[in-house]
A protein has these predicted regions:
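Terminal, compositionally biased non-globular sequences in eukaryotic proteins
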Residues: 1-255
Length: 255
């Protein structure tokens, strides 16, 4: 091929392209994502140094008391050794990637995607972006249903930057915020937030934030200094009476 074609390829004109093809688009947390990365050569041969797949999620973080949208790389893998793609050559490389338990469910404004990038020396690197539909595990779904059966309504779901005490475990957390509809709970609680810390087929570890309703002058002072929030760390197993276990934990913070 001519030098002219190589120069054009270096600035992205007539260069190699990449397209990631997933075997399916919907996945459950802890499932393995599989597919192939298809590379098609351009008008001239090019050296492909590396192909990277990176799992991303959007999230919200606070900067100077303002909420801004950001994105977090949750996992990245390299799927090849260096090779040369010839002009107009088509090559497929299979891959598999485990979904970590911290990946958020794609509900509300939460989005998850795989970014594919080719590392081509002295050239503009082509890339591809594929969105995933992430569903909760069976046990996580059972936990959320049990909370609603206790008398709470799911108000919103946000993916946010992990608080400082959790950042050694994860960059982001997905918060399920519930508002009480039960008269008994309404007397004591403002809201309930649940974060899934670890998930497997047989167990889930959750963090429950209980926001107690202010009662009297002492209660208002507690709210003023953010002392009205209590935390419960709880592991729920598949054979547990989930609703009863959650009720016991929540009610322990109402006494």
């Amino acid at each position: 091929m001519s030098l002219f074609n190589k120069v054009l390829a270096s600035v992205g004109v007539g260069a190699a392209t990449v397209d990631t093809k997933l075997h399916k688009s919907s996945y459950t947390i802890n499932e393995m994502v599989t597919g192939v990365v298809e590379i098609v050569g351009g008008n001239t041969e090019q050296q492909i140094d590396a192909i990277y797949l990176t799992l991303y999620s959007n999230f919200i973080r606070e900067i100077d008391d303002k909420k801004v949208n950001d994105q977090a790389a949750l996992q990245s893998i390299k799927i090849n050794e260096p090779f040369t793609i010839q002009a107009n050559e088509k090559r497929e490389i299979p891959f598999s990637m485990d979904l970590p338990s911290i990946v958020p469910v794609t509900t509300g404004h939460s989005r998850v995607w795989i970014h594919t990038g080719l590392d081509i020396k002295n050239a503009i690197d082509p890339s591809d972006k594929d969105f995933l539909d992430i569903q909760p595990t069976r046990l996580a779904s059972a936990v959320l249903s049990a909370v609603q059966n206790l008398g709470f309504r799911l108000r919103k779901v946000d993916t946010e930057q992990a608080p400082s005490y959790l950042r050694n475990r994860t960059k982001i957390v997905q918060e399920f915020e519930f508002q009480t509809t039960n008269n008994t709970y309404r007397r004591y609680l403002d809201e309930l937030e649940i974060v899934f810390l670890e998930q497997s087929e047989r167990s889930v570890e959750i963090l429950i934030q209980v926001d107690r309703r202010a009662r009297g002058l002492g209660g208002f002072l507690s709210e003023a200094f953010n002392m009205d929030e209590s935390f419960i760390r709880l592991t729920i197993f598949e054979n547990d009476n989930i609703q009863a276990k959650l009720a016991d934990a929540i009610e322990s913070k109402m006494r």
